[in-house]
Amino acid sequence: MANTATQTALKVADEVWIAAALLHRERPEAADFAVEEIVERAKREGLHKPLRRGVYVHVIQHSVANRPPNPGRYRMLFETGPGRRRLFRRGDSYHPEREGAKITPELDDLPHGYDVLISWYRDWCSAAAGNALNEDPLLALRGSGKRLWADEHADDYVRRLREGWE
C-alpha cells in the first residue's frame, strides 16, 4: 500500500498513527501493542524508506497523549502500561498541555488508499465507547452488596451500630 511519491510529505506522527491503526484493524482482539510492534508495523508498511528514527520517539513519547509533551503535543496514542500503546480515543485521559492537539491525521495528508482508516477509526471508537459502558468496573459493582442487607433494613443496621453511643 506504500506510496513513495508522498513519503517525504508524510509526517512521522501520521506514519505512527497508520501503523497503530493497521495493527488494531488486523488484530481486533488485541487491546494494545508493544512499542516494538508498532515500530515494526511502520517499518513493514514501508511508507518511508528507510524507516525514520523519529518513528520510535513518536511511539515512546511525542504522540502519546497521557505523557508530558516533549516537544510533540499529539494525542494519537495512549499508554496503557509500560511499553504498551493503543490508539487514543476521545474520553481517554491525557496530559493537560496536550489539550486541543491532533488525534488523527488529516484526510488530505494520508497517502492514497489509507483514507479508509479514518472511517474505520470512527467506527472503532464508537464500538469501544459502547463496550466501555458494559465493562466499567464501578458499574459492574451495582447490586453486589444487596445480600449484605437481605435480612436487615438499612435503618435498623445504623440504629444497631449507634447503640451505646452517647
Regions found by a protein language model. Give the residues of each.
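DNA-recognition alpha helix
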Residues: 19-23, 34-47
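Alpha-helix C-capping/helix-to-loop hinge sites
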Residues: 22-27, 45, 144-148
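Flexible coil/turn residues that form the inter-helical turn or adjacent wing/linker of helix-turn-helix
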Residues: 31
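Generic secretory/membrane-interface signal
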Residues: 1, 37, 73, 147-149
